[in-house]
């Protein structure tokens, strides 16, 4: 999953690498440089101020360190993403980075990526790695596709068959086309709560998706009484 973000970021960087002295992705609204360089990216001053918007921030790079200003916690989260990119660049720039100022705010309020955990139950560690990459490049919506014909990943109190049946995809028949690997798993309430908190601290909103009435074979296999046509009521082992 992370490779998709990295590939998109690399292609984007080719477009503006020549005009962005800090090579920040996405390109900030305004960048100005001053004389001198700095190797010190420690935050020496930060301040909440009015007027920078929900995700806007300003950053000043000086020989003594970094000064931040933002209006909301989301603005600080975006500033930290920029700082992480600058830290990576500094490790490859022994002479230091140019001193200067960065002012930024997004053109689009919704910058989302989807993870299809319905068709494949990804370990939480992989999802956290994906969130870290999203934050690095300032995406702000994690769309979690939690239910599908091929699996159900959302815990629902009192409906245990969603875990024992709906969350388990068996191996596909040998002669089946478009087969999927066997896969099983359901996230716990605590895991999802922790993920939401982790994302919030990075300026990312979690959008959970539960498909209904279509793409509900995992539900139908678990509780046929919830569906009208139960002839195909099984967790699908093929794509679709």
Which residues are covered by each model-predicted region?
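Hydrophobic faces of well-ordered beta-strands that scaffold small-molecule active sites
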Residues: 111-115, 142-144, 206-210
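Short, solvent-exposed loop/turn and secondary-structure capping segments
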Residues: 79-80, 125-127, 144-146, 153-158, ...
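A conserved hydrophobic secondary-structure block that centers on an alpha-helix together
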Residues: 116-149
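Second-shell loop/turn segments in exported
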Residues: 67-69, 116-120, 181-183
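Acidic, contiguous N-terminal accessory segments
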Residues: 1-7, 11, 15-111
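Short, well-ordered coil/turn segments that N-cap beta-strands
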Residues: 108-111, 138-140, 200-204
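Aromatic/hydrophobic pocket-lining residues that form π-stacking "cages" and hydrophobic walls in ligand
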Residues: 130, 195, 206
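Aromatic- and acidic-residue-enriched carbohydrate-binding clefts of CAZyme catalytic domains
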Residues: 150-201, 216-240
């Amino acid at each position: 999953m992370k490779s998709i973000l990295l590939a998109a970021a690399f292609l984007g960087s080719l477009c503006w690498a020549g005009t962005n002295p800090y090579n920040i992705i996405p390109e900030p609204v305004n960048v100005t440089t001053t004389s001198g360089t700095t190797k010190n990216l420690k935050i020496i001053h930060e301040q909440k101020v009015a007027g920078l918007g929900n995700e806007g921030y300003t950053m000043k790079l000086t020989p003594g360190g970094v000064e931040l200003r933002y209006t909301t916690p989301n603005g600080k989260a975006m500033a930290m993403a920029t700082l992480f990119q600058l830290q990576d660049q500094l490790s490859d720039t022994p002479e230091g980075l140019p001193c200067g100022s960065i002012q930024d705010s997004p053109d689009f309020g919704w910058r989302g990526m989807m993870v299809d955990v319905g068709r494949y139950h990804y370990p939480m560690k992989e999802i956290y790695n994906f969130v870290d990459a999203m934050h690095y490049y300032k995406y702000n919506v994690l769309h979690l596709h939690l239910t599908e014909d091929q699996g159900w990943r959302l815990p629902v109190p009192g409906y245990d068959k969603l875990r024992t049946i709906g969350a388990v995809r068996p191996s596909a028949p040998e002669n089946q086309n478009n087969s999927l690997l066997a896969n099983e798993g359901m996230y716990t309430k605590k895991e999802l709560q922790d993920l939401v908190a982790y994302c919030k601290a990075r300026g990312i909103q979690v959008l959970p998706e539960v498909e209904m009435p279509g793409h509900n074979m995992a539900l139908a296999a678990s509780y046929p009484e919830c569906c009208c046509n139960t002839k195909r009521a099984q967790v699908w082992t093929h794509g679709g």
